[in-house]
């Protein structure tokens, strides 16, 4: 097939090793494609046509001016059209030659196609996909059945010219990624020399591939204009195909695929744990998020990689799909509808009547068969009339898209797929009028109910009963001696040890043994606690002294643990006076409170395991002693990974905080040393309660008739700063705390740093299940900060003025709820995923047995967004519904996003004015999935969620006498 002026047809290449041929020499360009070789002038090249017989480009009447400037994404990510434009205007001779070649192509293809189908259909249906006869005609059809890109199809005819092109323009030097190579090439059996030669050409041609990574590529203005001028879109859906891949996708390490659940800090020094994460849920969510938290969107995302339990931000990126402009897609529809439908009609005659149908699968990076389109069912856009013709390189070879083409016969379920595609085609043609929400004052910083009118603790709370231990509540202090302003006394008076699988294994336990050598060199089991005491009581004057002390009772990790961050902080960050204060005052005080553990924490601490509804209340002094031991890495059985005893629990020892050269580590250490200085200088006097809540019964969301509650939404302020007295949401990881002891530094990690008493929950809280949450009441804020993730900076010490309740707990209630991680944008709209997120939020907001008037408002924000891939508007609606079901008001912080603030307020006002209850709104979410997302072949739906809801409710109101009565049904 002629590719236009200046293109040299491909000639047959002899097979190496065949009779009469020899292997290429060192100067032969076949073995060294990077070297330049002499290329004949294209005008002198013999005319030879090799056209795939089934190519739609060969249909009579399809030839046109586009054939000579088809775009291909494989040539150094530079379009062929762009390259040809640099050659100057076409001459009359070149245009004549192009038209002649085009006519010959059409004739050749028509003859071959007519000869091919009557004789080969039966063989194609009975022979495996790759075992095709290698006749010239069938060899052309081989490209339909092998997993090659549309561009490779064209290279079979243009190999030499590709080499000429690259000879004139030096290659970028980018290696060919494995994911771009054809897995089938070289695997199918070959029976003649022609096939061997062709596959050698395939391999040679693939050397010119330039990898295209959808994640980090952004379209240029020129590309966008070129694509908008392509007559490749017959419908809005097809325009989505053209432009959907322009959306930038970011790789995420959620705090972790490698994690601090899987994400190891990039700068963490010589070692990487690279521990895979298990955020994967029973619903099949991605493993890389096992032990990380997630960031608040739209703030910066932590791009460092961590290892076992980091926060979500360290997953480098999140897939974000921007909304497409309806008007631009409609314009493209008008330009291409006639041509696309005419071509598709011709194609249907040739494919449907002959019984050989071809299906093209588009698979964008990060998706699993998300975009499949049938040739016979969808006559619009990129998926119509383009599947196998080389011209598709212009329409599908966008530099922002990574496409894997699977050419295969349609299976027995073709009728069902054709029905779906026809419905999809009809759906994209319909026009949904936009409901325009009322204009809101642009200068407004908040909208909705004034925050002063929202319920807050302790004013709205019920009177607490006397604090008493019970079967479901462990209290580690003397409740009879509890006095305001006094340090609580531990209970019992003397240390009680339990070394079992239901309680925390304490460093001071008699069962915590360590192998030691006696005077005769024999190894015996000694007390590890005694070794810890001996090591820590040594004087620290240099960071190396602290490192040596920690490794004395962690010998197994002497060659694994890295203390670079600690050494750099001590030597390079601290001033001399600060370093002196650290090793003369703060560290000795920390050692003292750590070694007092058996006198402070006298009662065994129960593990909060899955499926438990249990609370643990302990004093702030006890928590300080436990955290000091965590700093010195004294907790046994908590360093092993994989299938160890505590593998389903977060890390607690601080060894990962000391590793690497990340700029985050000094700021984390500053924040934590501020806490230790404060609690060692003056003993805290409060209590903290940790409650694991596991629910079995959830609302039937379709039938929930509870009305929406009040909403205050603002783009200013923070949850911890402006949500005092409210239920404050921690955008948690399943392993609570995420990467706080590693490299994570987003919403959850920051909260755990400024309220360090939260960190002790990692000691005894097992990974959260889908129906569970962790509620922490009474923690104190010790630090103030600025920035986020990489820009986080410890600012100053903070004096927490929160009121205390009758149990001497500060009225700061924090709930840790973990959102799902979505690698594909559309997945979050699946009903099962929506229901899971509703249940998780409902579990965190519900307080069984407490009247609604005694429940404080929920202070939350963009939960599950950012690197977890959640849509902020969907997540806001989910939290509003869950709060309504739990009968709580909502205070929503958009973290600087004023547009999101207005959108959420407008939607909430729209729904409440029309008196839509929780069940009706939930049904609208189901409708949105079924009508817009289920059969969507692009990364994101054509119509966004909120416009769909506006239109659905308004349409329902027009068809009933009572507006809103049937909305959502």
UniProtKB/Swiss-Prot annotation:
Residues 311-325 have a biased composition (Acidic residues). Residues 69-84, 101-113, 128-149, 179-189, 226-237, 275-284, 329-339, 369-387 have a biased composition (Polar residues). The lineage of its organism: Eukaryota, Metazoa, Chordata, Craniata, Vertebrata. The modification Phosphoserine is found at residues 135, 195, 256, 259, 281, 286, 293, 297, 311. One of its GO terms (biological process) is detection of bacterium. Belongs to the poly(ADP-ribose) glycohydrolase family. Residues 1-149, 161-341, 368-400 are annotated as: Disordered. This is Poly(ADP-ribose) glycohydrolase. The gene is Parg. Its EC number is 3.2.1.143. A motif (PIP-box (PCNA interacting peptide)) lies at residues 77-84. Residues 87-100, 116-125, 190-205 have a biased composition (Basic and acidic residues). The modification Phosphothreonine is found at residues 137, 197.
């Amino acid at each position: 097939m002629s590719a236009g002026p200046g293109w040299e047809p491909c000639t047959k290449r002899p097979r190496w090793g065949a009779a009469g041929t020899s292997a290429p020499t060192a100067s032969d360009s076949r073995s060294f494609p990077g070297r330049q070789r002499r290329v004949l002038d294209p005008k002198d090249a013999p005319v030879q046509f090799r056209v795939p017989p089934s190519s739609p480009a060969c249909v009579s009447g399809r030839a046109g001016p586009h054939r000579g400037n088809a775009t291909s994404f494989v040539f150094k990510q530079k379009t062929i059209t762009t390259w040809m434009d640099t050659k100057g205007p076409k001459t009359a001779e070149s245009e004549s030659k192009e038209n002649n070649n085009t006519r010959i192509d059409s004739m050749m293809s028509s003859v071959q196609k007519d000869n091919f189908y009557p004789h080969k259909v039966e063989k194609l249906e009975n022979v495996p996909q790759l075992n095709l006869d290698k006749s010239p005609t069938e060899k052309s059809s081989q490209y339909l059945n092998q997993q090659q890109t549309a561009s490779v199809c064209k290279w079979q005819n243009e190999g030499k010219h590709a080499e000429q092109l690259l000879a004139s323009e030096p290659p970028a030097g980018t290696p060919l990624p494995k994911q771009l190579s054809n897995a089938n090439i070289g695997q199918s059996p070959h029976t003649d020399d022609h096939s061997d030669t062709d596959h050698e050409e395939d391999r040679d041609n693939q050397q010119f591939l330039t990898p295209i990574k959808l994640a980090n590529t952004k379209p240029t203005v020129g590309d966008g204009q070129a694509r908008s001028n392509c007559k490749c879109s017959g419908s809005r859906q097809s325009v989505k195909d053209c432009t959907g891949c322009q959306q930038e996708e970011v790789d995420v390490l959620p705090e972790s695929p490698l994690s601090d659940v899987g994400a190891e800090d990039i700068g963490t020094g010589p070692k990487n744990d690279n521990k895979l994460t298990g955020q994967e849920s029973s619903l099949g969510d991605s493993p890389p998020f096992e032990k990380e938290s997630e960031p608040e969107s739209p703030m910066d995302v932590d791009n460092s990689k961590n290892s076992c339990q980091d926060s979500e931000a360290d997953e480098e990126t999140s897939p974000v799909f921007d909304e497409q402009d309806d008007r631009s897609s409609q314009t493209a529809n008008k330009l291409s509808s006639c041509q696309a439908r005419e071509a598709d009609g011709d194609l249907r005659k040739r494919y449907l009547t002959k019984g050989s149908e071809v299906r093209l699968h588009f698979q964008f990076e990060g998706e699993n068969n998300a975009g499949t389109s049938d040739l016979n069912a969808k006559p619009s856009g990129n998926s119509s009339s383009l599947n196998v013709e080389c011209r598709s390189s212009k329409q599908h070879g966008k530099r922002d898209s990574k496409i894997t083409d699977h050419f295969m016969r349609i299976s027995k379920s073709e009728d069902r797929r054709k029905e779906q595609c026809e419905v999809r085609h009809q759906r994209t043609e319909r026009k949904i009028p936009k409901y325009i929400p009322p204009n809101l004052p642009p200068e407004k910083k908040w909208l909705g109910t004034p925050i002063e009118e929202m319920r807050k603790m302790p004013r709205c709370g019920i009177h607490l009963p006397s604090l008493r231990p019970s079967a479901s509540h462990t209290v580690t202090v003397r409740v009879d001696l509890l006095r305001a302003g006094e340090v609580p006394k531990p209970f019992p008076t003397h240390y009680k040890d339990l070394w079992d699988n239901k309680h925390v294994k304490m460093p001071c336990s008699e069962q915590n043994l360590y192998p030691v050598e006696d005077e005769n060199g024999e190894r015996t089991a000694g007390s590890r606690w005694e070794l810890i005491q001996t090591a820590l009581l040594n004087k620290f004057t240099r960071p190396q002294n602290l490192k040596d002390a920690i490794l004395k009772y962690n010998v197994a990790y002497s060659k694994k643990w890295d203390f670079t961050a600690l050494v750099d902080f001590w030597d390079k960050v601290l001033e001399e006076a600060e370093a002196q204060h650290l090793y003369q005052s703060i560290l000795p005080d920390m050692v003292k409170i750590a070694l007092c553990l058996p006198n402070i924490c006298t009662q065994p601490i129960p593990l909060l395991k899955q499926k438990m509804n249990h609370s643990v209340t302990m004093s702030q002094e006890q928590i300080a002693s436990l955290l000091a031991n965590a700093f010195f890495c004294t907790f046994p059985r908590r360093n092993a990974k994989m299938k160890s005893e505590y593998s389903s629990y977060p890390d607690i020892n601080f060894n990962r905080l000391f590793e690497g050269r990340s700029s985050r580590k000094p700021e984390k250490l500053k924040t934590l040393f501020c806490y230790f200085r404060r609690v060692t200088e003056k003993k805290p006097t409060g209590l903290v309660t940790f409650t694991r809540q596991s629910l079995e019964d959830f609302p039937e969301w379709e039938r929930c008739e509870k009305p929406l509650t009040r909403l205050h939404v603002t783009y200013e302020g923070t949850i911890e700063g402006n949500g005092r007295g409210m239920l404050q949401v921690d955008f948690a990881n399943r392993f609570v705390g995420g990467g706080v002891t590693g490299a994570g530094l987003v919403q959850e990690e920051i909260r755990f740093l400024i309220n360090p008493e939260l960190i002790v929950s990692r000691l005894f809280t097992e990974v959260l299940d889908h129906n569970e949450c962790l509620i922490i009441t009474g923690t104190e804020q010790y630090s103030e900060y600025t920035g986020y993730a990489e820009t986080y900076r410890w600012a100053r010490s903070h004096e927490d003025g929160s009121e205390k309740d009758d149990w001497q707990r500060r009225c700061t209630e924090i709930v840790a709820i973990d959102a799902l991680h979505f690698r594909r944008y559309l997945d979050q709209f699946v009903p099962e995923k929506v229901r899971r997120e509703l249940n998780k939020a409902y579990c965190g907001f519900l307080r069984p047995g407490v009247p609604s008037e005694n429940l404080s408002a929920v202070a939350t924000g963009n939960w599950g967004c950012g690197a977890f891939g959640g849509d902020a508007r969907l997540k806001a609606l989910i939290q509003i519904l869950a709060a309504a079901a739990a009968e709580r008001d909502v205070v929503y912080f958009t973290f600087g996003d004023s547009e999101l603030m207005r959108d959420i307020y407008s939607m909430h006002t729209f729904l409440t004015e029309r008196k839509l209850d929780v069940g009706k709104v939930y049904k609208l979410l189901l409708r949105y999935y079924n009508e817009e997302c289920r059969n969507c072949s692009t990364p994101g739906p054509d119509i966004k969620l909120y416009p769909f809801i506006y239109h659905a409710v308004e349409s329902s109101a027009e068809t009933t006498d009572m507006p809103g009565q049937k909305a959502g049904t």
